[in-house]
């Protein structure tokens, strides 16, 4: 399909003359697929959108002075301390106090030394942007120390942090313990990498060279260092995004080993297209892999990789660039139910928008692909094809299992050479790990994802938190095959991407990091929904209606609840579950039954009535005295949803209702009244001060009169002024035309003559082109070009021409007399055609 799409692009770019008369039908069908809008099943909009600094969704923010690039986040085991890695600094924040204004925190400065910065600048890197120490790895190594690595001005270094006093670890001489970070941390701060610690051993996926052309998946901090083989091209310019540890040995009947999975995007060599094709991958290695004895020494003997496929279900349009992956595992014992949530973008753009997609992969599908067939490449043609012949035993790339132990193979060091030689060229699996697309967002570029499994009142739901490239946070819930975006929050200023997300599931907090700082956002905000309808229509698994307010489900105690709590994530049946008083049809609501806001209008003015809606998915319904408002000259609903009133001919009680999924609720109610002579009553019967809504230019102060009569119309004056203006312009024009009518006739007659015999301008040579003897063309311009009026030459004038040297043939002359121009003109013979008579 991609090859066809590229052919279509070249077909569209070809000149019209080169196009075939009838293009192939497949190209036309593909063009229709590319131009059609995404189906509404996957393209969703957030129900609620809140701007930055909204009081309805408060959250806390941390930022230190002169510090930027907050990229690494780590939460302590007890959840009380948040460790943050930034540019040349690390922080230990209290989750309770540090995010408050003036809160205390611990800061640890760790910058690159001056010599490394000088070398970095000498190598052509930017001193301010590149030659700094960006913290890329921040992991717990033990119960007392943290392990961290930074770019250190393109000379990556690693060190240890004492968690007790938050200082760098030192040796007996007082020097900071530093280790070479090559192979653990990238040189370039813009390069993506991933790392995790398993049983005290560090597994990383990064690049190991200054140029960034030596990628590797390695294990360090161990007595058995192992890495991928660079000469075998196991990795093709990868961009690592995530890694995960899955304890597959628990409950395994085959005696399988634990595995570490790496997620990345790379160039797919198995595809042949006109441009390099990016492919999303999942790679795995065994925890007990020690390398080979003779073949693949200190190299992985269990490295296998496969393609992750995330595409549209309708037309197969691929989202092939992996941005982030979150591993959701219920428990170590239930690792078979592990889900991998991935955020993807596309290498190609469909239309004018650059969207993203969220796909979910199951552990069952991953294991099926890694247990399937292999691919191999033909060295001569560089073509990849499926291996169908038998493979050696034990199975290449598999961990040491009970079947291998029965063959006296208890370690990878004991694997036969034929198995390892086969693996060197057969590291790519033939199958593709297919996914289920949950969400397609054409208007947002998702970059980070975090998932929390929430127990609701009746079921368990997966809540997704998605960070965008422009500082927004989407909160969505997965309900079967569908996804509902609960809310959209602007947590950072526009242009700052969300660089990291971290969940504190025990305290119900979400931490998000960007270039400018770190924010602490509560996962739930049930107090935002003030009615039963809003609480249920939100589909928020954290919230339920308690009978009087929307509360967090963790507060639900069945034995203490006086009324049953209501929650319906699947159907959101607010019309059936909420109280009857909230769902009465607006057509039968008596006027004046609901509280009405008193507003005052001035006569002959244009006014608007606001109707703010909390939900982006709801529609408005305006009623006047219980009947729907129809568009007219004096009443019109604006595109914003506000009601525009022109004049005061139609007054009464105006109500604005919100309609969403069959549920109706009153949003606003207005009772406008006309203020005579611009004077407003100070108070109404209830003692409240009425609101004056007016758009007139002259308004009267309270208790006074306007300087202009509010009820006077200037329509007649306007017509009189327009008439006088037209007369003042037309009369002088007509007078000038009548006075100069004779001149106009002469001008028009000259134009007719010129149209019959147009004259050309004389060609006068410039001075520098004249002959050196001083002789030149006659001073009188020869503008007739062989035509001369018989009476043009004045008496006594004589011009010598060729007619005086040779006899003039009268037969070759031609005289014409025009009825428009009565003066005769003569055209001479061909010999003297250009002479002056």
From Swiss-Prot:
Keyword Signal assigned to the entry: answer is yes
Q: SUPFAM superfamilies from the xrefs?
A: Plexin repeat, Sema domain
Annotated membrane-spanning segments are 718-738
Write the record's keywords in alphabetical order, separated by commas. Answer: Developmental protein, Differentiation, Disulfide bond, Glycoprotein, Immunoglobulin domain, Membrane, Neurogenesis, Phosphoprotein, Signal, Transmembrane, Transmembrane helix
Highest taxon of source: Eukaryota
Q: Which GO terms describe its molecular function?
A: chemorepellent activity; neuropilin binding; semaphorin receptor binding
Q: Which residues carry this modification: Phosphoserine?
A: 793, 818, 830
Name the InterPro entries on file.
Answer: Plexin_repeat, PSI, Semap_dom, Semap_dom_sf, Semaphorin, WD40/YVTN_repeat-like_dom_sf
Glycan-carrying positions: 69, 96, 165, 410, 525, 630
Choose one Gene Ontology CC annotation of this protein and give it: postsynaptic density membrane
- Please name the Pfam families in this protein's record: PSI (PF01437), Sema (PF01403)
User: Which ranges make up the Extracellular topological domains here?
Assistant: 44-717
- Cite the PSI domain residue spans from the record: 525-579
Q: Indicate where this protein resides in the cell.
A: Membrane
Stated membrane topology is:
Single-pass type I membrane protein
**Gene3D superfamilies per the UniProt record, alphabetical:** ligand-binding face of the semaphorins, domain 2, YVTN repeat-like/Quinoprotein amine dehydrogenase
Q: Which GO terms describe its biological process?
A: axon guidance; negative chemotaxis; neural crest cell migration; positive regulation of cell migration; semaphorin-plexin signaling pathway
What positions does the domain Sema occupy? 47-523
Taken from the UniProt record, the cysteine pairs bridged by disulfide bonds within this chain are: 120-131, 149-158, 286-399, 310-359, 526-543, 611-656
SMART domains in the record = PSI, Sema
Please identify the protein, giving its name as recorded: Semaphorin-4B
Biological source species: Homo sapiens
Q: What is the lineage of its organism?
A: Eukaryota, Metazoa, Chordata, Craniata, Vertebrata
